[in-house]
Design a protein with these regions (language model features):
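Mobile genetic element proteins and their domesticated derivatives, centered on retroelements
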Residues: 9, 26, 31-38, 76, ...
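Surface polyanion/phosphate-binding segment centered on an Asp-His-Pro turn
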Residues: 100-108, 138-141, 145-146, 170, ...
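Catalytic palm subdomain of template-directed nucleic-acid polymerases
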Residues: 153-170
Length: 308
């Protein structure tokens, strides 16, 4: 089957007329799973909004509330989408909402994320979700991550901002680390490696800060990704499609084997490697780059010894 997904920062849905327009517009697009950011929903709104979505022709929906003037995320399902989608988890600030989608023997963890505007807060946020977001309920090799988000961060200062910036966005290093550690890829950029296209406009400034991220194991199954104008917000909508049949096993999330690192073989190999690696430190202008690479090498060393 083909799964269609979309992400859009709606810039507030408290106005009833706007909410009706947005819901009807999204229903007309016949998208299976839609992730909304910045809904400005409160707990008092939930039942009414869920009923309104169904009355407009939608299916089930989940919301994680912020306040009446900030944050809030939601996941809307198309009426004809009959697959097994269940609420999974949420944070306490209206920034994260996760659900699970089970298709055959595969489980897709769909995460809707709205990152902070403030750079320092965003760095802490990325570090926090790096440690918690990618933990699954079982150790199956058929767990896959789908992240639909407004990360408030442009990955490439020259391609993803107009006018181009001299410096990287605050938190871009943490963002890239999250992608690498969790084997994720930026769907739109992978299919459009050199294209300048933006998802957010304010005044003369444009940026691509909204993303759909997927596990690399499903990279060959993603197609039809596009950024379309959304008439009810200062953000554009990203839509993609995913062929869910015959997905090959991916590398999954690596977990260090504690028995391996206790072994004499590992301690001996690690000491030799570490003594040499410390000498390389002076070749790096940024010690964080040296340390990030060190962690990758430790992972590879551990995996190699585990296989022996």
């Amino acid at each position: 089957m083909t799964l269609s997904l979309a992400t859009i920062n709606v810039n507030g849905l408290r106005d009833k007329k706007k909410r009706d327009l947005v819901f009807n517009w999204l229903v007309a697009k016949k998208i299976d799973v839609i992730c909304l950011q910045e809904t400005h929903s409160t707990k008092d709104d939930l039942i009414r909004w869920q009923n309104e979505w169904k009355n407009c022709g939608g299916g089930n929906s989940f919301f994680n509330c912020g306040t009446s003037d900030s944050r809030g995320v939601g996941i809307l399902l198309g009426k004809k989408f009959k697959e097994n989608v269940e609420f999974f988890s949420q944070d306490n600030s209206g920034r994260i909402l996760r659900s699970t989608l089970k298709i055959n023997d595969s489980t897709f963890y769909i995460s809707n994320i709205y990152a902070p505007n403030n750079g320092k807060e965003r760095k802490s946020f990325f570090n926090a979700i790096n440690d918690t977001l990618f933990k699954y309920t079982d150790d199956s090799d058929k767990n896959y991550s789908l992240i639909l988000s407004d990360f408030n961060c442009a990955i490439q200062k020259n391609l993803d901002r107009n006018p181009p910036q001299q410096l990287d966005d605050i938190s871009v290093r943490e963002f890239q680390s999250m992608l690498h550690r969790n084997d994720l890829f930026d769907v739109w950029r992978k299919l459009n490696p050199e294209t300048k296209r933006y998802t957010f406009k304010r005044g003369k400034s444009k940026s691509r800060i909204d993303y759909i991220l997927c596990s690399n194991a499903v990279s060959s199954k993603v197609f039809g990704t596009r950024i379309n104008h959304f008439p009810f917000s200062d953000h554009d909508i990203i839509i993609t499609k995913l062929k869910t049949e015959d997905i090959n096993r991916g590398p999954g999330m690596w977990i260090m084997n504690l028995e391996t690192i206790k072994s004499e073989q590992f301690r001996h190999a690690f000491k030799i490697w570490w003594d040499n690696w410390k000498i390389e430190k002076n070749k790096y202008s940024d010690i964080r780059e040296w340390w990030d690479l060190a962690k990758n090498k430790i992972q590879l060393l551990t995996m190699e010894i585990s296989r022996n």
